[in-house]
UniProtKB/Swiss-Prot annotation:
Segments passing through the bilayer: 25-45, 77-97, 137-157, 189-209
Keyword annotations of the record: Cell junction, Cell membrane, Gap junction, Membrane, Transmembrane, Transmembrane helix
Role summary: One gap junction consists of a cluster of closely packed pairs of transmembrane channels, the connexons, through which materials of low MW diffuse from one cell to a neighboring cell.
Primary gene name: Gjd3
Name of protein: Gap junction delta-3 protein
């Protein structure tokens, strides 16, 4: 149970970035899959090979028939299913933690746009938020693909019913051998339940994917246009190409004023450069 608790804590961190539909998917994942499989599934399928009985004493025949009846154990198939479904959300959590650590380390070096104008479409905060939304959208899409792939695999491998009787023929069995499965009704109920949970999870993933795409379009419509690039106001008119050069009328007092104006222009250039760097 320690491994399940660790996986549950990682998945629980996803709800901070998830909408309501994503949180419903997380509840189904934690309760109806991880909890049920860890408590009930192990008890139902732990002795399936030991209780798989065939009416023959031929060495190796029972093991071969069991392998033909169940190419992959139900329990191990569902374990791999849960691990693969958990991979995209866990990777998104790792990405979010990495971005949070980078922001915490560079908070003092953040430009003014990131501190005072985070709603600007070109600000670093807006870019980071857009990048996080795209990563979450990708994780939901990968989760949906994994869900559909495993639902198809379960239907092809096992179907929806565990038969109590299995007729096995072929080497090393000398003839057609009758084999019997333990607790077939209980296993059938569990197989149908797990498939229904998978369908519900896939529907929630489709709904969440559609919700995220719709929210992205609405956000793009409401996004304000980027502000125009700032430019330095002209202090003087255009020089006369036929007039005397400006330095011909310079006076000592004008030189001192020019030095002050030069310092002011440098300060303005520094301010504009800082704004343009945002």
């Amino acid at each position: 149970m320690g491994e399940w608790a660790f996986l549950g804590s990682l998945l629980d961190a996803v709800q901070l970035q998830s909408p309501l539909v994503g949180r419903l998917w997380l509840v189904i994942m934690l309760i109806f899959r991880i909890l049920v499989l860890a408590t009930v599934g192990g008890a139902v399928f732990e002795d399936e090979q030991e209780e798989f009985v065939c009416n023959t004493l031929q060495p190796g025949c029972r093991q071969t028939c069991y392998d033909r009846a169940f190419p992959v154990s139900h329990y191990r198939f569902w374990l791999f299913h849960i691990l693969l479904l958990s991979a995209p959300p866990v990777l998104f959590v790792i990405y979010s933690m990495h971005q949070a650590s980078k922001e915490a380390g560079g908070a003092q070096l953040a430009p003014p746009c990131a501190r005072g104008r985070a709603e600007a479409p070109c600000s670093p905060c807006a870019l980071r938020a857009r990048r996080a939304r795209r990563c979450y959208l990708l994780s939901v899409a990968l989760r949906l693909l994994a869900e559909l792939a495993f639902l198809g695999g379960q239907a092809l491998l096992y179907g929806f019913r565990v038969d109590p009787h299995y007729a096995c023929a072929g080497p090393p069995c000398p003839h057609t051998v009758d084999c019997f499965v333990s607790r077939p009704t209980e296993k059938t109920v569990f197989v149908v339940f797990y498939f229904a949970v998978g369908l519900l999870s896939a529907l929630l993933s489709v709904a969440e994917l559609g919700h995220l795409l719709w929210k992205g379009r609405q956000r793009a419509k409401l996004l304000p246009p980027p502000p125009p690039s700032p430019s330095l106001p002209s202090q003087r008119g255009d020089p006369d190409p036929f007039g005397p050069p400006a330095y011909a009328h310079r006076s000592p007092a004008g030189d001192s004023e020019g030095e002050g104006g030069s310092g002011h222009s440098k300060a303005s250039l520094a301010t504009v450069r800082q704004d343009l760097a945002i």
